[in-house]
Amino acid sequence: MKKILLFLFFPILSFSQSIDHLFFEKGEINFSFQYKNKLQLNMISNIVSIDHKTNADLAYAYANQKQFLAFIKLGIDYEIIEKKIIQFENGSANNWSYYPTYEEYVDMMTSFEDSFPNICKLHHLGTLNSGREILIVQISNNVGVKENKPSFLYTSSMHGDELAGYILSLRLIDHILNGYGNTLQLTQLVDNIDIWINPLANPDGAYAGGNQDVWSATRFNADTIDLNRNYPDPQDGPHPDGNLYQNETNIFMGLADTVSFTISANMHSGAEVCNYPWDTWSNLTADDSWWQYVSREYVDSCQANSGNGYFEWSNGLNPFANGVVNGYDWYEVIGGRQDYMNYFKYCREFTLELSDDKTPDPNDLPELWDANYPSLLNYIEQSLFGLRGIVTDSITGLPLKAKAEIQSHDIDSSHVYSNLPIGNYHRHLFQGNYNITFSKNGYYPKTINATILNNSTNIEDVQLVPFSTTQVKEINPSK
């Protein structure tokens, strides 16, 4: 039995109608409105959550009751979109053409660790007020041991009704674990990268209608907050949405404080496009060429492996995008996870919009996997490329946490740091020649020159000389 989404448009509500009734069932509504220009759209995006389907003059948005009342005060005409849902019939677990119950999801995540204890560890990041958990698996050949490896992160479905990445992430975990030792690429990834995958970042939204299925999923979390507007923002600072940081937000910020991720991706659905930074402002990143390169690489592979017009997004806002877009050029997002990771955590994160259907027909999920899994693996592999090495004290040989900054290049927090306890740094760059300065309080800075080739690795270990060594030599010149 097919699930049919019927979008019914209703005219402006009279003020005599109860706003409470609109929010009784889900705590959020979906609506559309005409906007005059990008400036007005960006202003409105500070009030409500703009959705992916927005085009050159018509915007789609989500709002909780507080946000919707603020939007009404603008005096802009709108139409409520009521979704009447008839459930899809789940396919087979054997070919991943189904959405699990919440309990099945937990069992699957547990079974990954139980079946592959030498290379997989399940982390319980936190329990929500509902009792549902934020779960993540870590995959590495020496799982749980700090090594000279880049750490990579995939998360999906922080919008609870955007579930294409939920199943793809589960299948990706299964694919990597079963392929280790049997497939060269998968073995090399596990041996050389610390891989973290969280398939479901908003379980309360995904299972808003109960643990038995996802057909009543909501975009927002249980407190009707858009989690992708709830992070510290490079431009607007802490609490840009005016809300407390949600439990889910605190959990993932805590993870990013604990693990120094170098590359990550945040999976959504509702469009088919690779969205790279920034979302919050029009500034291009220092590494815009690199972002366009890896985004294009992801999309080109998807297009080649689908053969049916998949991932060819464009609209009136960017008619030449062909599946790749700068976030701000599309629409402004304030408080997004992507910009938080890039600006505050020095991690290269982009946003993957994996399907025009937010919750695809389960029977379409195998085809979605076939189109995406080579790209998902290739993006993980990007963790190995660029400039990398270990920074140590020239006297003691001990590892250092030092800043690595590229002269006349880095802007807006695009520099990186070496990470303890190893002292390893990872700087992902588009091909070219760069002067990189390493610095730390109490040490003389050191600048090196490095030539970078795309999809290649340049290893440059660096020793920093402490000030105290020079002072001792000056006092005791004979030594």
Model-found features: residue ranges?
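Residue-level detector of functionally pivotal "anchor" positions at catalytic/ligand-binding pockets or at interdomain
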Residues: 395, 465-479
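Active-site-adjacent mobile loop/cap segments within catalytic or ligand-binding domains
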Residues: 264-286, 320-381
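A short, solvent-exposed beta-strand micro-motif common in secreted/extracellular proteins
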Residues: 431-442
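Sec-dependent N-terminal signal peptides
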Residues: 3-13
